[in-house]
From Swiss-Prot:
GO molecular function: nucleotide binding
Signal peptide residues on this chain, from the entry's feature table: none
Family indicated by similarity: Belongs to the YajQ family.
Protein name: Nucleotide-binding protein CKO_02735
Alphabetically ordered keywords of this record: Nucleotide-binding
Lineage: Bacteria, Pseudomonadati, Pseudomonadota, Gammaproteobacteria, Enterobacterales
Keyword Glycoprotein: no
GO terms for cellular component: cytosol
Amino acid sequence: MPSFDIVSEVDLQEARNAVDNATREVESRFDFRGVEATFELNDANKTIKVLSESDFQVNQLLDILRAKLLKRGIEGSSLDVPEAFVHSGKTWFVEAKLKQGIESAVQKKIVKLIKDSKLKVQAQIQGEEIRVTGKSRDDLQSVMALVRGGDLGQPFQFKNFRD
């Protein structure tokens, strides 16, 4: 029986490349001359720390980072940015977390979405991924389109497609 897995992963090497590209752009931009503005990727925590001298500049840096992530194939919705920025001395910073895996609440929404579609497929939650099995490949492709079209707050990838 054909099956595939729904996952939500961020390639850390691509994220590192995007952070490096964003750093290069900030170094060459006129409005950031003489300003302390940095990006730091923490592989262990899967976070990106954005630091600058004002909250407005932190927002600008986040926009640059999102653009560079998108260019490297990582959607902006995979970046979880807190609403409040931290003010410490003369600097402002924010730690944006890269979303890895699918949370259980989102998993339940996906399974409910698939079951409500009345397609002849079964969805099973397996850890941080969802296995979808069905008799026809067309039904599985319909499920892929359904999950992509649903506004669930994070990007999804499909892997382990088996016939």
